């Protein structure tokens, strides 16, 4: 395994590596529904208006969002760089009670990706609210995305309702697609009726926007996405990991203890891109594109396919600076392809 890999994001960073030179102003802002996220518009540069991206009234400094499970609770990365450069981030998936997760080894690097079966390890919603979010607040001034998981409708609604009361939380991301836990979560994401049921239940107990995170391990993700929209979802996050495994040829056993796990990384980017493209044609709510993104070019492709913002997952585990670097590279990459406004390219690949 590469020396850059981190299991569970228990990372000790060198503060001397922190650098904060990023594009200023409104150059890379994005709107997601009704949630405004970003600096005051007075900070805009002369080219800021030309580079803004809007979708409803939600606003981000840029479309780059570290994905849940690959960025810890954010403060770990704050020792590396100023995480306020991010659009926002989705913190580690949270359940009602603490979970120790699956046996180890539960994460392994393989060509073009990573296989993991963490098992939703987390301290539980009360500990996240009382301990993790206050610590994050000292280094991150923006609202974040709370990723919630559950093993029953009651658990989903309980966790979501508690995060709904948190000022630091701007969006609640409902994970109905986690492939790592036996007899939980995944069942809600495999049928239209089950996905709609959890969506409607969570929507009934919160006022904050909810984004439903969908699994690609289904026969018709477009129908499930549409069912979530009809049930009241404010947006969608897709895709979660594909199912996969690798076998150690020396031991002749699977490389992770749980045998199978979620496969993520650059190899799944074409699958994720196609899924975003297909779902965009079927729904009117915003999409956060996820899956194999590792460059500014990938971000632009995702947005052309229909994503309003882009989450970056496995790449964070391989290169912890990747989100910061992509944000830095976006202006020059946009110029390279003759893109003047990010808002103009959302869904642009559907026009041909």
Language-model features: where?
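Glycine-rich beta-to-alpha transition loops that act as phosphate-gripper elements at the mouths
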Residues: 71, 147-150, 214-220, 269, ...
